Amino acid sequence: DVYARLTERQLRSRLESDAGVLVAESEKVVRVAIREGLEPLSLLLEERQLETQADLVRDVLALPRGGEVRASAGHVSVESCEGVPIYVLPHDQICKLVGYNVTRGVLCAMRRPLERSAGEVLDGLPDVRRIAVLEGVTDATNVGAAMRSAAALGIDAVLLTPTCCDPLVRRAVRVSMGTVFQVP
């Protein structure tokens, strides 16, 4: 359901926790998210990526909830060992599952971090000098690009007004290259 049938709104309020679920796409974004403390719930890999992403799979398996990948009947399936399930499918099946052709070969469902107020963000930063405010930016691509630019420019925090697109939707996360998890 997480990769196929649920809308971004449904993911946000998913049963997993009070915080919901987000989907990170690409090895780089998944690695940044894990490094920033997000909890993976499952990993979906293209079959052709299994060998090249072996380090990522090992890293996910090494996490406290890690699972186990097993090959069977000419394709790879998953066994969850009280951990993170890792699903491996051919490219065409992943495209059919997620509903679009661009997947970068790696998708990871992750527990969504709790939203913080502007006060909570600013109180958590000891030496804030540069703050960007996004107001009324409703396109996920633009929000992701703004987050990526903010990181490149050394902005200390980015505040989004309620009229902005959710910065944790799949497209915004992908375009930000994971910086949405790094810049408060």
Label each region the model flagged:
Residues 1-60, 164-165:
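Boundary-proximal intrinsically disordered activation/regulatory segments immediately upstream
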Residues 7, 46, 80, 116-121:
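Short, solvent-exposed coil/turn linker segments
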